[in-house]
């Protein structure tokens, strides 16, 4: 916060090589002149349940069903969780008090996980769907900050009884009676082509042309052309703060925040 405040006082925000920057050791965009690219994703529908908790509150949630907690200045309520389905990530990896978590983890009636490894999460689950690794499936490797899209071709067949996440969820959809609605009669390669085609259309608005999917898949990667002008963070805001407001209550750089000050 004070770094942004100092940069604002110096008046360099929105200028080339000026302003401020964070996450230099955790993101791959340092010195990157590319704008954020509109890579597309799979259609996901809308979850009708809007309630949520921060992931760091998992243990608290299991310990205190119906209890209240503070989040972003609001009072939210913990649900009474009877079943957990965890796919992607591992709560036993990023929670500090593991003894507390292990005890709270016993409260739900059923724990289901998609897991690659026989780790703590798998050992504390009731049902385990053995998921395979990125080496055992076809996929795309991309990042909105990265100008290169890579064809991630599987290097080996699935080990033993492991399955891709798509195969696991398709199997569940079949058992629940909505296989066709979930898969739309597409296999994994069809969905990869869908992402490619929809990304190609999105990039046309930026005057970027994609090759044919078959040519990309054979070559193994596609690199976007470098823009003629480099992007300067907050340059539009500097030129016209009314037309390009920031995502703050005031639309400006806030050295102090009445909203945060009112948090209990």
Residue ranges and their predicted role:
Residues 2-9, 170-175:
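Short, hydrophobic/amphipathic alpha-helical patches that form generic packing surfaces
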Residues 43-48, 155-254:
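N-terminal leader/propeptide and maturation segments of large enzyme subunits in energy/redox metabolism
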Residues 78, 144-147:
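Active-site-adjacent bridging/hinge elements
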Residues 126:
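Catalytic, metal-anchored helix/loop core of enzyme active sites in primary metabolism
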Residues 135, 147-158:
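Short beta-alpha connecting loops at secondary-structure transitions
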